[in-house]
Amino acid sequence: MVASSPETLISAAQKCLCSRKKRLSPSSCLEVTIHIIAVDLGVKPALLYDSNGASPDQLQLYLHSLQESSVVSNSLRIMSINDNTFIINPDIMKSHLGELLKSKSLPLIDVCSSRKRPVLCAFERSAEEMVRSFLEVFMNGLDLVVLEEELYKDWNLCTFFGILLGYPASYWFEQTQGFENCLSMTPLVVCTVWVRWQIHEIKQRCCLYSFSVPEELWSDVQSHIQRWTDHLRERFSKQTVLTDICFSRDTVTLPSVTL
């Protein structure tokens, strides 16, 4: 990995990722770069880009600039689904999804609005079908993949995005009942994972993962999340670019939760 200057990376991000909605701040530019580096290093399978509404083509342009500067490898891909754009490490993603299909061990949390409280449910067949359908498209090897609505119109994208991002648990709800959920005023355990990246004199801190689990279900999923944490530590130890990994946990209660 070539150590480009912070100014060069910030300038490239602001140039490539310009948007009518929002100009990226220098700090945001470096955070985006850290996320992409983490994907490239296999610390996380994918990044959902939601910083300022930049298009998939703009993201591809920025990714190419990072690749040309040898900041990241040439193996990353971009996928767009329902106006959401992901940057994906194909090898890590295939391994991640293959293991998921084999074990079917991902805890799904049913938060249908018709329920009084969230409950754990088995790995739904619909979730398995989403993963298999995605892999069939993803295996075509294109650098930029745009999923057609016909493919994902019946998918629960909340569940699917949680799977793609490598979360140790994902929310699920019956879409035919609407998109509301039963998490209002429900205590949630919010887990975050932080890292640092030193580039010249700057030590940039970044939140790599943030996910939640209803507090009343924590004891049921704690062992699974601990295994996920141990596996993440193992992957993190195989690289030296990112440092100071830190895990934190807080409990919050909100009047409404958007998934």
Swiss-Prot record:
InterPro entries named among the record's database cross-references: DUF4504
Domain of life: Eukaryota
One Pfam family matching this protein: DUF4504
Family the entry assigns: Belongs to the UPF0739 family.
Protein name (record): UPF0739 protein C1orf74 homolog
Species of origin: Danio rerio (Zebrafish)
